[in-house]
């Protein structure tokens, strides 16, 4: 059953790949958004040289390219073939040599243990049938002292609905919603507790208020429907 659910999830994102970057929040369009993302990455990235990094659930490569621009070697993985194809197209177009993209299941990575200094994901956990197994898998491929970073949100917060076109708002997900344990998101505090339960140390989090404010302002400027999702980043380290 899990494989069938994953195929439905992959098919959904596969169809969205050609226009994924046009959807709200999937790109940086304003100086305030740029400043927010710079602060976020300054906050969560380990302060040591070039890192071997994995972007789990990379989509079309937003975080992959952000990390590469900071001098890191990055592999992006995604279960949706069209997302990987679009990420590779962008990589070739931009001439970015320090990135690679592979079609892979974030719950069952094709890498040996202790392969990376950093594993990062954005808005992925809530789409997975086995999110806790994914966290274990991400920890498995991290080196001692390596860091896990999750950027996510609580998409049912208050009266807010999920982003248009997302898995949460799509009728095709009605049949599998009960098999996605984190559908709708989890709170920052819940993810911090989850990190600790899985053995990570020096766990911390940030509510991303600057990013939320920047995106809210952009909604006003573009005449979009107002949404007030809670967003956050949580990070923790593998013990040495």
What are these regions (language model features)?
Residues 217-240:
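Core SAM-dependent methyltransferase catalytic element
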Residues 132-144:
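A short glycine-rich, Lys/Arg-flanked "PGG" loop and its adjoining helix->strand segment in the class I
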Residues 120:
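A conserved beta-strand element that flanks and buttresses the S-adenosyl-L-methionine
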Residues 7-8, 24, 151-217:
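C-terminal alpha-helical "lid/dimerization" subdomain adjacent to the S-adenosyl-L-methionine
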Residues 1-49, 62-66, 174, 209-211, ...:
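Conserved class I S-adenosyl-L-methionine
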Residues 123-124:
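Short catalytic micro-motifs in class I SAM-dependent methyltransferases
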Residues 50-52, 114:
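Nucleotide donor/acceptor-binding cores
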Residues 52-56, 60-108:
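Class I SAM-dependent methyltransferase SAM/SAH-binding core
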């Amino acid at each position: 059953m899990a494989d069938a659910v994953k195929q439905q999830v992959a098919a959904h994102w596969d169809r969205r790949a050609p226009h994924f970057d046009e959807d709200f929040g999937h790109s940086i369009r304003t100086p305030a958004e740029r400043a927010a993302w710079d602060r976020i990455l300054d906050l969560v990235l380990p302060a040591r040289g070039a890192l071997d990094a994995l972007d789990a659930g990379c989509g079309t490569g937003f975080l992959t390219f952000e990390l590469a621009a900071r001098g890191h070697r990055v592999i992006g993985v995604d279960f949706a073939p069209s997302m990987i194809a679009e990420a590779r197209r962008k990589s070739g177009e931009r001439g970015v040599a320090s990135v690679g993209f592979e079609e892979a299941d974030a719950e069952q990575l094709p890498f040996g243990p202790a392969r990376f200094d950093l594993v990062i994901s954005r808005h992925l956990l809530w789409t997975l049938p086995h999110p806790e197994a994914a966290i274990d898998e991400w920890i498995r491929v991290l080196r001692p002292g390596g860091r896990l970073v999750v950027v996510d949100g609580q998409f049912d917060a208050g009266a807010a609905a999920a982003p248009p076109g997302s898995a949460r708002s799509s009728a095709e997900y009605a049949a599998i919603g009960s098999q996605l344990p984190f559908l709708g998101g989890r709170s920052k505090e819940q993810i911090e507790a989850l990190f600790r339960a899985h053995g990570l140390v020096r766990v911390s989090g940030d509510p991303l208020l600057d990013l939320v404010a920047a995106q809210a302002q952009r909604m006003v400027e573009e005449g979009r429907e107002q949404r007030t999702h809670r967003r956050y980043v949580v990070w923790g380290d593998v013990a040495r």
